[in-house]
């Protein structure tokens, strides 16, 4: 059906309700380089056409409302409205469509991820004409992207700060996540760091509870870091979680981390919010702190294939808001993760120029305009047998974040850390020598066991541990 357009400034106002597609479905529209583009997966209600649904999404996420209003005549509607410019069916799915929508850049506040998401996804997901709606991808134009500071430092600066090159980084989340005293917590940190890990981490649940107040934890962790650094000669760190109930308290904790001289802090960016995260990122940039970002609550938003927001969008907006690390799943571990989709979003976290690649779920090319890179963190149910696959999938510019795969070693935390480090270095060396990690990964680990009793013990404990479940959200 040919598009119908209407200029409110030249047409006499008529009260009433009219179809969204009259104004907001514009298949002849030529996308501008300054437009923010969005790809939505739509599932219309029975009897509702995809054109009407796509137009409704464009309207409700920009200038439209459910009825004609006379104040439309006081502005240039054609200048400010969102436009559904293309709709395509989803292959293999019944009654699902991808709607492509263009938004004028004037609709968004500069440097505000909060405003961007409030506009695009803030209200339209509850629209009754849709059974389900999912934001699959965004294209951020260069002129808008340049209003964001992005990550505090980025991968290259982080490696310079740590003086660590040519291999992936290793971390460990301290377990049990809740219940330890600050002193015992610090002891666990020390054992992991002296064994060969680069980082240890507060779990996202750990903030400042009665059994371990934040100030005590910070002190004992700093003591562990300095002791391990002195013994190993390597720079070490612990992700001190500064997430708090208000921003004033968050800054107080970050200030204390600066006074202690530690290299990195942590924030839960979804539960803490984008406004707090952007503010904390700016603080870290100004005070020389690295910022580790945890994605607690993400699966509530991104796991269902038909409704919500894909993680690639969350990763994109986090790179704009700011962070040096971001948890990104593992594919092979205990958490949800599709291999092709994971390739797509770890590339957009690290690279400067991303090309459209529907095989990896990337709907739009994206030029990051030199914005600093974001290091993926592979975390969740991983152990030494996973190391070849992890290195093959993620490459060197990644932090491999163990938990039980370090602390569950039969000889203790330090031995678990040794096993992790030996496995990583063995796989890195084999890859550098031209061996296929996919084909020979298990053989590489077995060969390394001959030279490390700690790795051999770890391999024996976890030789039959797998997480073979079907992926809910896959391409």
Curated annotation (Swiss-Prot):
GO-annotated biological processes: carbon fixation; photorespiration
GO molecular function: magnesium ion binding; monooxygenase activity; ribulose-bisphosphate carboxylase activity
Cofactor binding remark: Binds 1 Mg(2+) ion per subunit.
Keywords: Calvin cycle, Carbon dioxide fixation, Disulfide bond, Lyase, Magnesium, Metal-binding, Methylation, Monooxygenase, Oxidoreductase, Photorespiration, Plastid
Highest taxon of the lineage: Eukaryota
Active site: residue positions: 175 (proton acceptor), 294 (proton acceptor)
Catalytic activity, as annotated: 2 (2R)-3-phosphoglycerate + 2 H(+) = D-ribulose 1,5-bisphosphate + CO2 + H2O; D-ribulose 1,5-bisphosphate + O2 = 2-phosphoglycolate + (2R)-3-phosphoglycerate + 2 H(+)
Residues flagged as site, Transition state stabilizer: 334
Enzyme class, UniProt record, top EC level: lyase
Binding positions for substrate per the UniProt entry: 123, 173, 177, 295, 327, 379
Modified residue annotations for N6,N6,N6-trimethyllysine: 14
Region forming the signal peptide: none
Description of post-translational modifications: The disulfide bond which can form in the large chain dimeric partners within the hexadecamer appears to be associated with oxidative stress and protein turnover.
Cofactor(s) listed in the protein's UniProt record: Mg(2+)
UniProt family annotation: Belongs to the RuBisCO large chain family. Type I subfamily.
Subunit structure: Heterohexadecamer of 8 large chains and 8 small chains; disulfide-linked. The disulfide link is formed within the large subunit homodimers.
NCBIfam families: PRK04208.1
Record's protein name: Ribulose bisphosphate carboxylase large chain
Origin species: Euglena longa
